[in-house]
């Protein structure tokens, strides 16, 4: 990447190509407490099993969350319209999924927010939120509130709080997700009857969801 950057800089200097910097202004839309009951929160698809459970945890804390469907080529093509193709592939998919959902007409832009994780470190995942901000603005959705999930206080929103109940249920969701992922992917290639592993997984997924809803630790430990 550094070699590519140096080559581009040398080419620009050789051909005397200079571009005036374009100032990008951005007003941060707020996600307020009142929006909890009125807004649908869109989340990009990153881990199908885990996010299905996290959706349940969010619901029990009063947030109406919708997880985007599995990624396909159309989401990638949509993302490339608003994100430079030299960013990491998950960022392209993430922006594409969200913009595609907003353009679908299934969600009212005035009653829709977006949630995304943010690492807050040196990883590019820290920049997913700014990329999404720019992508939504370019796509014609500058007023969509963005909620950042992180542990260092970046981009706080007054209407999204980490309550003890939410954190407990989220932790249960992640542990259940890891467990399901390990046992399902380990056994599915060797199933005797095609589809039987998925059927068993779906049964226990519903049991796990019920446990996340009631937050019963005795049931969880058993």
Predicted regions located by residue number:
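An N-terminal assembly and electron-transfer interface module characteristic of large anaerobic redox
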Residues: 1-222
């Amino acid at each position: 990447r550094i070699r590519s950057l140096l080559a581009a800089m040398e080419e620009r200097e050789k051909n005397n190509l200079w571009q005036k910097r374009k100032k990008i202004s951005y007003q941060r839309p707020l996600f307020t407490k009142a929006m909890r009951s009125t807004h649908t929160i869109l989340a990009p698809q990153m881990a199908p099993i885990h996010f299905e459970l996290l959706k349940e945890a969010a619901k029990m804390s009063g947030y109406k969350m919708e997880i985007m469907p599995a990624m396909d080529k159309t989401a990638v093509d949509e993302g490339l319209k608003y994100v430079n193709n030299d960013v990491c592939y998950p960022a392209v998919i993430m922006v594409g999924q969200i913009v595609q959902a907003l353009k679908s007409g299934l969600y009212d832009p005035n009653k829709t927010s977006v949630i995304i994780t943010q690492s807050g470190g040196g990883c590019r995942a820290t920049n997913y939120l700014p990329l999404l901000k720019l992508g939504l603005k370019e796509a014609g959705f500058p007023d969509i509130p963005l909620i950042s999930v992180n542990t260092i206080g970046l981009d706080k929103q007054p209407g999204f709080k980490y309550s003890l109940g939410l954190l407990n249920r989220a932790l249960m969701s992640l542990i259940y997700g890891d467990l399901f992922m390990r046992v399902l992917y380990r056994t599915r290639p060797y199933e005797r009857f095609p589809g039987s592993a998925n059927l068993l997984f779906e049964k226990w997924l519903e049991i796990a969801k019920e446990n996340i809803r009631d937050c019963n630790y005795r049931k969880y430990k058993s």
